[in-house]
């Protein structure tokens, strides 16, 4: 790289970093406001931030490689942490079909670059791992509420129930036996997958690094997370690896509430949410209200029309609405399922899913030009007084 090119790269890097600081500040401003109408603006800013970050990584790697050449450093030393490792992984993915072939080819590529991995599932490039982990947290606003583990085992729920108090024993008296019930439920994990075919244009281009990167991190990861959220909230019926909050039959874990009839000046929806909050009060943790957009609007309209608020206009602000009904945060569900308003305590729904940052989560279907990402997963409500589901009459 000649000196003018080097200076141009350095200037571009400084410009991108400065832009990212500004973008993060703008995003933070919208997050404080937390208004639903600002969501498209936030998504556009986050997209630009992501594109800038990818370009920053690329330029930094080019500059680092330029610095290392005169010093005679071994370019293989930090292979697993480099951008080149990501490109090489996608090259392995495109050239090999089947999980075992991909694992063997990636193992050979790591060895070729002086990297020894003791984990039998092998380690993905660090930058891809970080991007996937970030995507898992950011692609669906509900996902953060769940307690997520990567054990890959059968989920077992043990509930010990006794309504009797401890007793005081006096000398000479016989201790009275007290009844208790221990229930054990198990859920067999299921495979949640996303099998994505590639457009003709992409086939002809043989899929560039950036397109593959975006496909895996953005689209495929998000699709899997969205499906897991739907299973946890609504779809899980005990036969598909999940027992959803909506279909949980144990009334000590999830309370089912139906709102009272609507009448002028009354707040049956808000009252039902407060009843749900009272139910989960014994359980420590942040309390979330998960609702569809139309239910959030219905709640806001009801609060504004309440007799008690006749002279006060409730702001169209999640924080203010949440404080009115006693929850810590409102999350707007963006999926397509028939979700009922749900109150859930943080980390009280347990999901176990196979780690998406392991190489055996990926498979390239060469014959049909498809890419497969999958995870073995299951989920259930973990504790008593974990949440409530509200039917709006």
Swiss-Prot record:
The keyword Transcription regulation does not apply. It comes from Lactococcus phage p2. It is found in: Virion. Probably cleaved by the viral protease during maturation. GO terms for cellular component: T=7 icosahedral viral capsid. Capsid protein self-assembles to form an icosahedral capsid with a T=7 symmetry, about 69 nm in diameter, and consisting of 60 capsid proteins hexamers and 11 pentamers. The capsid encapsulates the genomic DNA. This is Capsid protein. Keywords: Capsid protein, Coiled coil, T=7 icosahedral capsid protein, Virion. Residues 5-69 form a coiled coil. The lineage of its organism: Viruses, Duplodnaviria, Heunggongvirae, Uroviricota, Caudoviricetes. Homomultimer. Belongs to the Skunalikevirus capsid protein family. SUPFAM superfamilies: Major capsid protein gp5.
């Amino acid at each position: 790289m000649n000196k003018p090119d080097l200076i141009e790269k350095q200037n571009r890097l400084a410009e991108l970093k400065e832009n990212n600081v500004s973008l993060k500040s703008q995003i933070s401003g919208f997050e404080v406001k937390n208004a639903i109408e600002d969501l498209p603006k936030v998504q556009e800013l986050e997209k630009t931030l992501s594109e800038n970050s990818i370009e920053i990584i690329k330029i930094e790697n080019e500059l680092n490689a330029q610095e290392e050449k005169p010093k005679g450093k071994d370019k293989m030393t930090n292979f697993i942490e480099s951008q080149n490792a990501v490109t090489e992984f996608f090259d392995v993915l495109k050239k090999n079909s089947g999980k075992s072939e991909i694992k063997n080819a990636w193992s050979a590529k790591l060895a070729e670059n002086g990297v020894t991995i003791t984990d039998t599932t092998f380690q993905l490039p660090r930058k891809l791992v970080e991007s996937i982990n970030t995507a898992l947290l950011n692609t669906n606003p509900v996902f953060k509420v769940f307690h997520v583990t990567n054990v890959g085992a059968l989920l077992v729920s043990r509930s010990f129930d006794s309504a009797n108090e401890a007793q005081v024993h006096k000398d000479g008296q016989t201790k009275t036996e007290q009844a208790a019930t221990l229930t054990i439920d198990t859920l067999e994990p299921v495979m949640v997958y996303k099998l994505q075919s590639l457009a003709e244009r992409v086939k002809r281009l043989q899929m560039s690094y950036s397109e593959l990167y975006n496909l895996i991190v953005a689209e495929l990861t998000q699709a899997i997370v969205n499906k897991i959220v739907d299973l946890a909230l609504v779809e899980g019926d005990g036969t598909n690896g999940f027992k959803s909050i909506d279909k949980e039959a144990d009334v000590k874990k999830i309370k089912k509430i139906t709102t009272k009839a609507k009448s002028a000046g009354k707040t049956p929806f808000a009252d039902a949410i407060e009843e749900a909050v009272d139910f989960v009060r014994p359980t420590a943790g942040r309390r979330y209200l998960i609702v569809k957009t139309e239910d959030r609007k219905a709640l806001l309209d009801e609060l504004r029309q309440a007799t008690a608020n006749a002279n006060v206009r409730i702001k169209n602000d999640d924080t203010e609405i949440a404080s009115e009904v006693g929850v810590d945060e409102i999350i707007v569900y963006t999926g397509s399922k028939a979700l009922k308003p749900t109150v859930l305590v943080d980390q009280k729904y347990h999901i176990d899913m196979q780690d998406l940052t392991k190489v055996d989560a990926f498979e390239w279907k060469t014959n049909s030009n498809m890419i497969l990402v999958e995870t073995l997963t299951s989920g259930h409500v973990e504790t008593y007084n974990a949440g409530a589901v509200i039917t709006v009459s």
